[in-house]
């Protein structure tokens, strides 16, 4: 997901360590939920499920990853996507096709007894539906963790809140937040700390990117960074064939963006896409106040409705409660 800016950003990444990340984090909810749904699975790739066959991997992730964040003096605020912009339709269609193909491959691998392939394809088949969204919001409310409904893109909303000074930084695995103007982006704090790549398990550490340092280092403006992304390709356009990150920077610096962007097949005019990144629809009135968890409500939801063991849930609640009072909004202003 997101734009392929990684090669241009490597030298601007900071490794702050957990001690340097205390504050209020505007978390891209869908991004985090996909991580939970893909990563929290059984050996054969099957997600955690309750007695009614409803997926619960995301609920486990929300309880224990948030406990981890709060123990590290990070106050998470979850921002949910709203209606996608019309020019994202092609990308969403392709993602659905990828998930469907992965689901078929998962089933085939299971029949063949190939557990490693089954898990890989199962992770790629993850999807977010109305139940996942509604149950996530319900659990977050019970945990006392604020959540916000964005009118369209969650990353745009998170970026707006960061620019506004209401949160310390935006959290997402994608780099789109920089295009939306987030002055501070943090990656890898809602993941488990381990990542499997080509069969190897690697450690994952927090990364931080500051927009001002990126723009200064690349000698571009915010609008020019967006132009670079459009030349490469984003969730909203296909990019120019044969143009990679370094070539895109060269084109923009030479003032030839409009000469080359016409070579791509786009559903929207480049100025419309630039305008969307610069001034996206956002909710300007929101409440990010965190509260103490409601243990009875959490236990009723997770244990009563979804079959979690009470001992496990109480352990998560204890971790949340132990630090909750230290991670309120007042601590950061």
Swiss-Prot record:
GO biological process: DNA repair; DNA replication, removal of RNA primer
InterPro entries in alphabetical order: 5-3_exonuclease_C_sf, Flap_endonuc, Flap_endonuc_arc, HhH2, PIN-like_dom_sf, XPG-I_dom, XPG/Rad2, XPG_CS
CDD domains: H3TH_FEN1-Arc, PIN_FEN1
Region described as N-domain: spans on this chain: 1-99
Entry keyword Hydrolase: yes
Pfam families (UniProt xref): XPG_I, XPG_N
Coiled-coil residue spans: none
Keywords: DNA damage, DNA repair, DNA replication, Endonuclease, Exonuclease, Hydrolase, Magnesium, Metal-binding, Nuclease
Cofactor binding notes: Binds 2 magnesium ions per subunit. They probably participate in the reaction catalyzed by the enzyme. May bind an additional third magnesium ion after substrate binding.
Highest taxon listed in the record's lineage: Archaea
Entry cofactors: Mg(2+)
Protein residues bound to Mg(2+) 2: 174, 176, 235
Molecular function GO labels: 5'-3' exonuclease activity; 5'-flap endonuclease activity; DNA binding; magnesium ion binding
Region (Interaction with PCNA): 325-333
Binding site for Mg(2+) 1: 28, 81, 153, 155
E.C. designation(s): 3.1.-.-
UniProt-listed SUPFAM superfamilies: 5' to 3' exonuclease, C-terminal subdomain, PIN domain-like
Location of region: I-domain: 117-256
Transmembrane segments: none
Similarity remark: Belongs to the XPG/RAD2 endonuclease family. FEN1 subfamily.
Subunit structure: Interacts with PCNA. PCNA stimulates the nuclease activity without altering cleavage specificity.
Function: Structure-specific nuclease with 5'-flap endonuclease and 5'-3' exonuclease activities involved in DNA replication and repair. During DNA replication, cleaves the 5'-overhanging flap structure that is generated by displacement synthesis when DNA polymerase encounters the 5'-end of a downstream Okazaki fragment. Binds the unpaired 3'-DNA end and kinks the DNA to facilitate 5' cleavage specificity. Cleaves one nucleotide into the double-stranded DNA from the junction in flap DNA, leaving a nick for ligation. Also involved in the base excision repair (BER) pathway.
The protein's name in its UniProt record: Flap endonuclease 1
Encoding gene (name): fen
């Amino acid at each position: 997901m997101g734009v392929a800016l990684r090669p241009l950003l490597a030298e601007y990444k900071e490794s702050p360590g957990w001690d340097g990340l205390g504050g209020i984090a505007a978390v891209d909810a869908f991004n985090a939920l996909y991580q939970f749904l893909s990563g929290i699975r059984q050996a054969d790739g099957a997600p955690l499920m309750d007695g009614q066959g409803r997926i619960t991997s995301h609920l486990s992730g929300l309880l224990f990853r948030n406990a981890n964040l709060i123990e590290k003096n990070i106050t998470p605020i979850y921002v949910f996507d709203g209606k996608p912009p019309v020019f994202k339709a092609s990308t969403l269609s392709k993602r659905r096709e990828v998930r469907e193909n992965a689901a078929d491959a998962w089933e085939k691998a299971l029949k063949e007894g190939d557990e490693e392939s089954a898990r890989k394809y199962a992770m790629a088949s993850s999807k977010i539906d109305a139940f996942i969204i509604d149950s996530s919001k319900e659990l977050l409310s019970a945990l006392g963790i604020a959540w916000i409904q964005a009118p369209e893109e969650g990353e745009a909303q998170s970026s707006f809140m960061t620019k506004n000074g209401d949160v310390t930084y935006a959290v997402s695995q994608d780099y789109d937040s920089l295009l939306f103007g987030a002055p501070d982006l943090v990656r890898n704090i809602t993941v488990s700390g381990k990542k499997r790549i080509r069969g190897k398990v690697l450690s994952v550490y927090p990364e931080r990117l500051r927009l001002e340092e990126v723009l200064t280092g690349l000698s571009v403006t915010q609008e020019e960074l967006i132009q670079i992304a459009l030349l490469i390709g984003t969730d909203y356009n296909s990019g120019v064939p044969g143009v990679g990150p370094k070539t895109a920077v060269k084109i923009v610096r030479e003032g030839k963006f409009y000469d080359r962007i016409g070579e791509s097949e786009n559903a929207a005019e480049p100025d419309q896409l630039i305008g969307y990144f610069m001034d996206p629809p956002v909710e300007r009135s929101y409440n990010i106040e965190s509260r103490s968890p409601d243990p009875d409500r959490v236990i009723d939801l997770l244990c009563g409705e979804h079959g979690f063991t009470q001992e496990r849930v109480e352990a998560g609640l204890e971790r949340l409660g132990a630090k909750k009072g230290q991670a309120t909004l007042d601590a950061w202003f």
